[in-house]
């Protein structure tokens, strides 16, 4: 049985739709289930529903053979997993944002984010020294209350930035969800996993 870890929410919904297009027989009530572990005996699959950051942990430690994770998580975590396929779902991007017309001041201006590794790498590559402040939610609040000069966050439609009076200043990277695999699982179940990859690849919408 293949075990696949997936994040709850938008990625889960789009991934389930993709699996169905690839002719995987998932039950109609699959999306409505409140279970965190769902077995689909007909396809010899088990699904684990988790928080996005935890999906990569489950795959790295072999609790799940495969996982679906956003490229933003993979960039931030840098875990020991293989990236097999760009699923082209949950499209968004990582960006630097802030209040319009406000310049970064001081020797090491502050940047708030839940992606400290991504932010540190980006500003270092830009030749800018910054102080990173890690937050876990409501990142847009940081410039409004004077906690930070800039934020680094995921942007989808830009609506949240606009509603909080912020503007996108720099685009860091495009983000889509990826199919990842545990290296040991790939060696042991390579043939089965490759069949899954081929079926998904055949139905992925091209950008």
Swiss-Prot record:
One of its GO terms (biological process) is L-histidine biosynthetic process. It is found in: Cytoplasm. CDD domains: PBP2_HisGs. Keywords: Amino-acid biosynthesis, ATP-binding, Cytoplasm, Glycosyltransferase, Histidine biosynthesis, Nucleotide-binding, Transferase. InterPro entries: ATP_PRibTrfase_cat, ATP_PRibTrfase_CS, ATP_PRibTrfase_HisG, ATP_PRibTrfase_HisG_short. It catalyses: 1-(5-phospho-beta-D-ribosyl)-ATP + diphosphate = 5-phospho-alpha-D-ribose 1-diphosphate + ATP. Its EC number is 2.4.2.17. Pathway: Amino-acid biosynthesis; L-histidine biosynthesis; L-histidine from 5-phospho-alpha-D-ribose 1-diphosphate: step 1/9. Its main location: cytoplasm. GO terms for molecular function: ATP binding; ATP phosphoribosyltransferase activity. Disulfide bonds: none annotated. GO terms for cellular component: cytoplasm. The keyword Nucleotide-binding applies. NCBIfam families: hisG (TIGR00070). Lacks the C-terminal regulatory region which is replaced by HisZ. Belongs to the ATP phosphoribosyltransferase family. Short subfamily. Heteromultimer composed of HisG and HisZ subunits. Catalyzes the condensation of ATP and 5-phosphoribose 1-diphosphate to form N'-(5'-phosphoribosyl)-ATP (PR-ATP). Has a crucial role in the pathway because the rate of histidine biosynthesis seems to be controlled primarily by regulation of HisG enzymatic activity. This is ATP phosphoribosyltransferase. The gene is hisG.
